[in-house]
Amino acid sequence: MTFLDRTMSFWAVSRGLTPPSKVVPMLNPNQRQFLEDEVRYREKLKLMARGDAMEEVYVRKQETVDDPLELDKHDSFYQTTKSLLVLFQIMGVMPIHRNPPEKNLPRTGYSWGSKQVMWAIFIYSCQTTIVVLVLRERVKKFVTSPDKRFDEAIYNVIFISLLFTNFLLPVASWRHGPQVAIFKNMWTNYQYKFFKTTGSPIVFPNLYPLTWSLCVFSWLLSIAINLSQYFLQPDFRLWYTFAYYPIIAMLNCFCSLWYINCNAFGTASRALSDALQTTIRGEKPAQKLTEYRHLWVDLSHMMQQLGRAYSNMYGMYCLVIFFTTIIATYGSISEIIDHGATYKEVGLFVIVFYCMGLLYIICNEAHYASRKVGLDFQTKLLNINLTAVDAATQKEVEMLLVAINKNPPIMNLDGYANINRELITTNISFMATYLVVLLQFKITEQRRIGQQQA
């Protein structure tokens, strides 16, 4: 209280009046949150000074080095998705490896001198040899062929652009191997931390057969698409398909990887939500809610790490889909206008539906994962009856809601783009704009030719 306040109070009391009340400062939401955090941390220090504090209240407890054997025991996500990781190693796409169970050594690692990388280099060299032969053959045939029709140019542009994705593999995939290893270790540590906190493991139902099915389906779909192009295009030789089999299969496997991880994020969020609901019904759940808040933040960080680890690969993925879809759609419509529908246009539409299907799966699964981890989890928190719990629990629920607001579970490609349903609509609108402009040029050119002939 200032000197002026004391003077006014003395003057009011001496005359039998009520002294003026203390002016309460007006705080904005950020200042109020900071003040409440400081008050709660001071309460924590007082509890610690009296020796009756709970170690996990308010602050994240210090991380400890876990037993690698225990990590392996509870790493059900690795065990159920191991088939896809092994397939990536065989194809030379992502040569990460499992480290021996030693202390202070991450369970998943990446080393340029490992046997997995050496195998990837060997496979990549063999595959690149075939790609170069096919690329040279297609370019030579296109340049020397007397048939310069537009549909021939469209087909060559599409399939040559697909071949170039092979040359981007070391830069887009191998270079980010350490980030992928970090992401895999985050999953391993998260599952064990979840078990220690809740007392029950995360169960991924049907993930093992689903992963195996996707591995087989990825290659079967690649074979089917390439053989369809072989039968629908007279100039597409059978040996060309051997260059495209691993490329299309790689695109399918990356789509499968994205689907599996998004599905696993939703499963982990649902398991955490169920454990939280059970804890809320117990006595004094504030201590556990602090750990649940840390688990949720870790889950949100894992979603962000997925996009960071595969940012270049999925960025290239989206660009290939965008470019191929525009060229194939324009080529098919243009040829139908000029010469009518043929089997070649059917082949172009197969490519269009394939590319748009991949983009839809990636964006739709990312949308569902973000909703399950974010909105659905937040909705369950808001439905908690806070009047039936103590003050510490109420505060922990509020802090968990703040954590969700401050760490939105967004699937982001390292800042390049957010993967959600909006990306689908944006791509479709861009493609429609480009197609309208290109078709306007096409119609104008036809009118000019018609006027000249008349």
Swiss-Prot record:
A single Gene Ontology MF term assigned here is: taste receptor activity
How this chain assembles, per its entry, is: Gr21a and Gr63a probably form a heterodimer that responds to CO(2).
GO BP term, pick one: signal transduction
- Cite the record's tissue specificity text: Expressed in the adult labellar chemosensory neurons. Carbon dioxide-responsive neurons coexpress Gr21a and Gr63a in a pair of chemosensory receptors at both larval and adult life stages. A single bilateral neuron, expressing the Gr21a receptor, is responsible for CO(2) detection in larvae.
Q: What protein is this chain from?
A: Gustatory and odorant receptor 21a
Q: Which GO terms describe its cellular component?
A: axon; dendrite; membrane; neuronal cell body; plasma membrane
The membrane topology noted for this protein in its Swiss-Prot or TrEMBL record is: Multi-pass membrane protein
Q: What is its main location?
A: membrane
Q: What happens when the gene is disrupted?
A: Impairs CO(2) avoidance of larvae.
So what family is this one in? Belongs to the insect chemoreceptor superfamily. Gustatory receptor (GR) family. Gr21a subfamily.
Pfam families xrefs: 7tm_7
Give the source species: Drosophila melanogaster (Fruit fly)
Give the UniProt subcellular location, in the record's own words: Cell membrane
Membrane topology, Cytoplasmic segments: 1-114, 175-206, 259-312, 367-422
Q: Which UniProt keywords apply?
A: Behavior, Cell membrane, Membrane, Olfaction, Receptor, Sensory transduction, Transducer, Transmembrane, Transmembrane helix
